[in-house]
Curated annotation (Swiss-Prot):
It comes from the Eukaryota. Oxidoreductase; part of the gene cluster that mediates the biosynthesis of the bibenzoquinone oosporein, a metabolite required for fungal virulence that acts by evading host immunity to facilitate fungal multiplication in insects. The non-reducing polyketide synthase OpS1 produces orsellinic acid by condensing acetyl-CoA with 3 malonyl-CoA units. Orsellinic acid is then hydroxylated to benzenetriol by the hydroxylase OpS4. The intermediate is oxidized either nonenzymatically to 5,5'-dideoxy-oosporein or enzymatically to benzenetetrol by the oxidoreductase OpS7. GO terms for molecular function: copper ion binding; oxidoreductase activity. It is an enzyme of class 1 (oxidoreductase). Belongs to the multicopper oxidase family. The lineage of its organism: Eukaryota, Fungi, Dikarya, Ascomycota, Pezizomycotina. This is Oxidoreductase OpS5.
Amino acid sequence: MMRPWTILIASSWLSLAAASASASACAAKPSVAAEIASIDHDNCEHGPNSRGCWGDYSINTNYYEQAPDTGVTREYWFVVENITMAPDGYEQHVLAINRSIPGPLIEANWGDEVVIHVTNNMERNGTAIHWHGIRQLNNNAHDGVPGVTQCPIPPGGSYTYRWKAEQYGTSWYHSHFSLQYSVGLQGPMIIHGPATANYDEDLGTVMLQDWSHVSPFAMWWYARVPSGPPSLSNSLINGKNIFRCTDPLDKNCLGTGERSEWHFEKGKRYRMRLVNTGLYSNFRFAIDGHNLTVIANDFVPIEPYTTDNVIISMGQRYDVIVEANAPEDNYWLRAIWQTSCCPNDYANDTLGIIRYDPQSTALPNTTHPALHYPDNCDDEPAEKLVPHVKVDAGPPARTDVFNLYRHTYDMPRGFMWTLNDTYLWIDWSKPTNLLVAENDTTIFPPNYLLYHTPDGPNQWVYIVFNDISERNRSHPMHLHGHDFFLLGTGEGNFTKDSPLQLKNPPRRDTASWPKRGYMVFAYKTDNPGAWLIHCHIAWHSSQGLGMQMLERPGEMTYTEDEDQALHQTCQSWNKFYESPEQYIQEDSGI
């Protein structure tokens, strides 16, 4: 068990921070979301001018405490395999689901049950699929993290995931096995529900992904040395882009790439669901000639605000509404690389096209001021991310501090990120859930980085992260099984004088920890399980930047089918992993 550094926060300090936040809230002007909240939503029909309605529920429903039970099951069958594709016109080996990148859309309504059968037809890789942002209330067995909630699915094996859509909005699913999702093993998710602003049409997900023509597995060696990994080759929007061939002798460069396109009709309002599924890319999203009204971050509806661009880090989502009020023409949709965060060979060429005339084939001749904005490796300003359903952070049962370092070890490990001097390194064959199920929890391996939450239900835990690594990189931290209550971020180390926002703080499941700074977050122990928290820069999670939150292990329960699946998958995995053809673990495993 990892030993955090525990601190006690004085009640007077908390009261001061709460009072300050409360005073700021009182001074706020009425918002569009407040107007929607004032409408009687009971049993009203969800439509273009009543998006806050949802039958017996509404945008005002506290989704942490109640959700519909539709009785509807949405069922999907996924086949994972090694194939050759050319998403941007450059042919290469990829990992794909149902032979597509991104994989199939998972679509459900708030309150539906979702069942996904995953078959692994890869040749030498295990896998497991994580449903990013899905709360998995009392359902830890289906979180899809190898070495934590299950053993990997071996080649030729299958696994069934089952979960309820208890929140609504936009997300994605991806492999949580090493670097697999950066090679294509990912796809979009939409959970339909109410919204904090009205719109006419839902255009679905806009998936922003960095892309490399050299396999990230081949680049992994370079990621472990001081110079870091080389620049990536390109980026994709919804699995498409153009790559400009420069070597006429390169037979892999087919030149068949194309841009993703959308059609706007003058006067309509469109919902677009932005998802950053990148390996280590920060994007600034913008559409030339149009503003964006932001209505949700991750799975949390927020009070709408209007901007001309949105910063989106790895693992994050923003739902935006775009009004088609520009002159009828063609416009660039942009995912602008923040190159001071991470290099890319074609940083300004991640483009889609908005067309008012669907018959047009002309390229846009437009620009955007965001091309000249300073790079931003952090998040949208916290003061803009105001949750519509107001929830305050309770007083902490315990507050613990974790300091981030960067240590050098002998190869093959090289550079590793550590929290309180320990890096995460799991054993695929001995997942935490298996040890809990078999009551073998007396001694967890130190590199499992197990953080035991306070005993008892509904205790508030405060976590302080300090970055003292002296590295020039922020970290998008993703928490499984919960939303962060983001109490504060800032430069330098956290001190007792650092301000905290306790009244309705921003909530989301992926938040950026500033470079050489601190992040303080809270969550309530209302969901038994082993929950991973990790950096969503894939290089960094592979280099050990993460830990496990072991929450109320005595209340972790399994159905007979879940227990059987856990043990059978581990038996099959161990049999495969002992064979000469096995894939050797070369990173943290997640």
